[in-house]
Amino acid sequence: MTLRVAINGFGRIGRNVVRALYESGRRAEISVVAINELADAAGMAHLLKYDTSHGRFAWDVRQEGEQLWIGNDVIRLLHERDINALPWKALDVDVVLDCTGVYGSRADGIAHLEAGARKVLFSHPGGNDLDATVVYGVNEEELRAEHRIVSNASCTTNCIIPIIKLMDDAFGIESGTVTTIHSAMHDQQVIDAYHPDLRRTRAASQSIIPVDTRLAAGITRIFPKFHDRFEAIAVRVPTINVTAIDLSVTVQKPVKAYEVNLLLQKAAQGAFHGIVDYTELPLVSTDFNHDPHSAIVDGTQTRVSGAHLIKTLVWCDNEWGFANRMLDTTLAMAAIGFR
């Protein structure tokens, strides 16, 4: 039976989820029945079809009133600010993918359920009171039918968690630091303008800008044993897509760089195929645009110091990879049933 999905928020992730659904050939498994977005219908259709990062959508897209047509599929468009007023019950929605980047609390999830959805998946980190936080490929098997309010974590958490798991299982991680080198985002300014964060008052295209990150908290949410053993910082750089993560960990077992690369390469070809990829080609960030993997290890940048300090560089398309994991987690939530 085809899963009936609604999307709340049709920004970068919401639109990429729809594109990924059609490009991945999973329309027999998932049907988008409604999209809620405060923007007007014409703008929604236009930005789905034309995308600066990912190019022109291969499918025919047209908008008729409050309906969005993709090929022969019709999707109802909504413009409702109040979650409680959304018609999820009338639309028989199985799972809501909340891609607003605004909502993420348990109360927000309950509001979607009370509106008639059977389950909710947030496209960003939520509070500790959510039923589960999933990094697909690592812990989706922990999902239970009673888990109705779930977070898909963040794009950077999805990128780094598989690598941390692999290194910890093989070498035993003592502690680590992470630096996220992230493309500019919508909460930055085109030209200097006011923002509560004074660094984000500055033009995104002209500076490398340090920003706050909760990635360390995201790591410990998946692996509680690393509480107080990981720290993270983040900078935004003047590109529009693709992120690099510099991961440094101290490990218990002595190791050489080639052993680290061999571990990650084998994982990419085996247990983590489709989630982790590995390359030693001389590539740059744009080469990973539209890559569906959560993490792409750059083996040319692996270093080991003193046999116990490992440094690796991991790439991800912070939009496309994450959108594909949203679909994976949605199907995993459905596979365990509804209660």
Curated annotation (Swiss-Prot):
UniProt-annotated location(s): Cytoplasm
Binding site for substrate: S154, C155, T156, R200, T213, R214, R236
Pfam families: Gp_dh_C (PF02800), Gp_dh_N (PF00044)
GO cellular-component term (any): cytoplasm
SMART domains noted in UniProt: Gp_dh_N
SUBUNIT field: Homotetramer.
Name of the protein described by the UniProt record: D-erythrose-4-phosphate dehydrogenase
Native species: Cronobacter sakazakii (strain ATCC BAA-894)
